[in-house]
């Protein structure tokens, strides 16, 4: 489908950014046909982009249809909070977590986390407790290999026992001199990245693009959630949603699409 050039859209000075999990798709699941249609209609009137903590391959799995490259479906694609960034299909400069932190500190952090998780008493443990990404590490007490049913079970358990929140508090104190941010997101994990490398990082890529208005839609907009910083940032108009259906309803109401 041909894409209308931004300057020919109804609101060429407006950018709408989206979180992925819980906003455009159910957590770690694929985008719905209704959401895709809504985004296509929205792209006719404004510029659109996504910003997620996962690497681009995971966002490709969730947002791509029929093998289409996800970076072609959005004007801006920000993986790992914008540390891997694309503008109109062209990659921008990237950053590296490991180069910033250093191997020695990184290993101390990882070793502590693995020992901590080993001692946790939770219903199930699977695999991939720590996932290394370009701009952060993702830590999951249950393991990212958990299936959908196990993820749902852990999410319910975590709401009552505060497994992730407690671990984050411990890490903040233990590694307070590392200059790190700990941010809970999704169902089963939390992200660890340098202070300032939250989702607001992506805004540096669009600040000089001439937008008058930048909307952001996210579901983890509470303090400590991984959408909070960009949600409250003065450069954006934040919208808190509960699920993809809520996102669609809000978009139709705001942009009359």
UniProtKB/Swiss-Prot annotation:
It is an enzyme of class 5 (isomerase). Mg(2+) 2 binds at residues 231, 233, 236. The active site is at residues 19, 21. GO terms for biological process: GDP-mannose biosynthetic process; mannose metabolic process; protein N-linked glycosylation. One of its GO terms (cellular component) is cytosol. Keywords: Cytoplasm, Isomerase, Magnesium, Metal-binding. Pfam families: PMM. Its main location: cytoplasm. It is found in: Cytoplasm. Coiled coil: none annotated. Pathway: Nucleotide-sugar biosynthesis; GDP-alpha-D-mannose biosynthesis; alpha-D-mannose 1-phosphate from D-fructose 6-phosphate: step 2/2. InterPro entries: HAD-like_sf (IPR036412), HAD-SF_hydro_IIB (IPR006379), HAD_sf (IPR023214), PMM (IPR005002), PMM_cap (IPR043169). Its EC number is 5.4.2.8. Involved in the synthesis of the GDP-mannose and dolichol-phosphate-mannose required for a number of critical mannosyl transfer reactions. Homodimer. This is Phosphomannomutase.
């Amino acid at each position: 489908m041909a894409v209308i050039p931004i300057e020919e859209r109804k609101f060429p000075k407006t950018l709408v950014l989206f979180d992925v999990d819980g906003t455009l798709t159910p957590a770690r699941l694929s985008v719905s046909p209704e959401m895709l249609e809504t985004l296509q209609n929205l792209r006719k009137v404004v510029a659109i982009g996504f910003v997620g903590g996962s690497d681009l391959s995971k966002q490709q799995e969730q947002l791509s249809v029929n093998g289409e490259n996800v970076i072609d479906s959005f004007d801006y694609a920000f993986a790992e909070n914008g540390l891997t960034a694309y503008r109109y299909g062209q990659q921008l400069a990237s950053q590296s977590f490991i180069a910033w932190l250093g191997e020695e500190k990184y290993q101390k952090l990882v070793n502590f986390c693995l020992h901590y998780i080993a001692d946790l008493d939770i219903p199930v443990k699977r695999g991939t407790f720590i996932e290394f990404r370009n701009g952060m590490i993702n830590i999951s007490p249950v393991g990212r290999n958990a299936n959908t049913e196990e993820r749902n079970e852990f999410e319910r358990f975590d709401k009552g026992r505060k497994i992730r929140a407690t671990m984050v508090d411990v890490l903040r104190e233990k590694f307070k001199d590392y200059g790190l941010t700990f941010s809970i997101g999704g169902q089963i994990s939390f992200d660890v990245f340098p202070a300032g490398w939250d989702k607001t990082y992506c805004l540096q890529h669009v600040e000089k693009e001439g937008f008058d208005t930048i909307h952001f839609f996210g579901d983890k907009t509470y303090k400590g959630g991984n959408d909070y910083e960009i949600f409250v940032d003065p450069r954006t108009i934040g919208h808190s949603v509960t699920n993809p259906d809520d996102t669609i309803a809000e978009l139709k109401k705001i942009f009359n699409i």
